[in-house]
Amino acid sequence: LAVDGRQRVYVATGGKGRVYRLEKDGSSPKTVFESAAANVTAISVDDRGELLVGTDSPGRLYRVPPDGRAFALLDGPYTQVQAIRPAGNGATWVLAVSPGGAAPSAAAPPAAAPATAPTPQVSTEVPIVAIGDSTTVTPATSGHATGTTSAPRGAVYRLDADGLVDTYWEATGELPFDITVAADGRILVAADNGVVYALEGDPVRMARIAQVPARQLTRIIPRGDRYLL
């Protein structure tokens, strides 16, 4: 679900990749986005009613102007667009993943992705952790140390206000499930094995800032100076 500045509600659906808009007056829902994708997996809307829509099978990102025609901004190697998070500087951060395994090669057809996100195993809170001496900071290209080099399982993309998309970070370790933009501009990533990463800088630096006793962290939600996982 997403709500625009006029308090209209946008509903993403599975089975058929559609987005419906519900007006405040209770009139019949209007289809504002329709595609051949299996599911709409992420949506974001600004105050003007412009939509960003993420899908799976295939994993694409679309822009839908108010009462306009959808066009694709991103058609990458991952099977699912998992999260869309606007930032205060006009940029938008997009998380794309391949839940079933490594991202396919450019020559391979898109792999099928699960229609629903995995069920989280724990609900807890962790404070914001500043990057410092107690935090493990590694180059973004190294990922999580596993003893072998693995193909990326997901990526964070940066969408500029003018529509340009570039790859900011690729996940070669834990599978990422969600992202959020911290007040200081860092991108926080909730991932497999109860791990939370922070991404900052350009070129990007990755810091492992927290770990909780959970198999998966499927959401990270800001609550003041803390986060609900």
Identify the function of each model-found stretch:
Residues 8-11, 50-53, 91-95, 167, ...:
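Conserved beta-propeller blade signature
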Residues 14, 56, 97-99, 192, ...:
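Short loop/turn segments immediately following the C-termini of beta-strands
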Residues 17-21, 59-63, 147-157, 195-197:
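A short loop-to-beta-strand structural motif that recurs across blades of beta-propeller domains
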Residues 41-42, 82-83, 177-178, 219:
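Conserved beta-strand position repeated once per blade in WD40 beta-propeller domains
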